[in-house]
């Protein structure tokens, strides 16, 4: 049954969704996708606006980030298939589920906003594919929103660090650090590799130290990104009170 469901999802993405969701499918293009992210108000999370001809508009996806628009396609296709298989899923379930993902699942650290003025966002991107998606978002923030980038970054030693460093924006200020796990790459070694890759920045022994430095150096109008290894994000979230992040 699982294999059948996965195969049906692929078919739905290729065939059914383009007919039912022409507006939403077009959002796969990053330039279009960003238009679907509604900045509701300060200190409130961004939300992706979803339009589907099979039910009323006004459905908002709590998880933000450009790559989430593609994830929505898979979710909506899977829900259509589950309904066809006999599962009872009403319109209210769509609204409740999409707008309360984090509260219902406990999911954290996926393009999660922790502060305004300056904006501080965290996300995990511990491999090349992950950072390809993050790079698109950072590029938009820098080039279209005209915000300078301050990036707190760390990785574990057993990943393809060189390839990830090549994807990072060259015009950002970096705060290289390490997570509180044995696998974490030492911050000085990471900084050496980063400098060789054309990046600029300073190393810090802990995530807390790095984030504090970024907050001190970043003007209110600019942008702080914290990411790399999932452990970096975990250390950040574990120290939200210490860093006065809400």
Language-model region placement:
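Short internal beta-strands
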Residues: 1-3, 150-152, 172-180
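Residue-level signal for inorganic ion chemistry
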Residues: 9, 31, 71, 123, ...
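C-terminal helical cap/extension that packs against the catalytic core
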Residues: 16, 44-45, 119-121, 128, ...
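Hydrophobic/aromatic beta-strand patches that form the interior of the parallel beta-sheet core
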Residues: 25-27, 152, 175, 202
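Short glycine-rich anion-binding loops that position phosphate/pyrophosphate groups of nucleotides
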Residues: 126-127, 157-158, 180-182, 230-232
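Glycine/aspartate-rich loop-and-adjacent alpha/beta segment that forms the canonical ThDP
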Residues: 229-246
């Amino acid at each position: 049954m699982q294999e059948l469901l996965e195969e049906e999802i692929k078919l739905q993405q290729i065939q059914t969704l383009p007919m039912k969701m022409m507006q939403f499918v077009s959002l796969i293009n990053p330039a279009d996708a960003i238009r679907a992210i509604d900045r509701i108000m300060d200190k409130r999370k961004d939300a992706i606006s979803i339009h589907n001809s099979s039910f009323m508009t006004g459905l908002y996806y709590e998880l933000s980030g450009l790559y989430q628009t593609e994830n929505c396609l898979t979710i909506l296709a899977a829900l259509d298939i589950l309904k066809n298989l006999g599962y009872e899923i009403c319109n209210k379930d769509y609204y409740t589920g999409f707008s309360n993902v984090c509260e219902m699942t406990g999911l954290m650290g996926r393009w999660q906003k922790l502060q305004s003025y300056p904006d501080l966002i965290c996300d995990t991107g511990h491999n090349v594919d992950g950072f390809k998606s993050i790079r698109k978002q950072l590029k938009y923030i820098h080039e279209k929103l005209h915000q300078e980038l301050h990036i707190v970054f760390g990785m574990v030693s057993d990943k393809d660090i060189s390839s990830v460093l090549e994807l990072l924006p060259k015009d950002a200020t970096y705060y290289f650090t390490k997570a509180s796990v044995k696998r974490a790459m030492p911050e000085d070694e990471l900084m050496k590799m980063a400098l060789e890759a054309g990046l600029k920045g300073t190393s810090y022994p802990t995530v807390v130290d790095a984030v504090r430095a970024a907050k001190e150096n970043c003007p209110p109008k600019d942008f702080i990104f914290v990411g790399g290894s999932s452990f970096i994000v975990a250390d950040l979230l574990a120290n939200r009170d210490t860093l006065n992040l809400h």
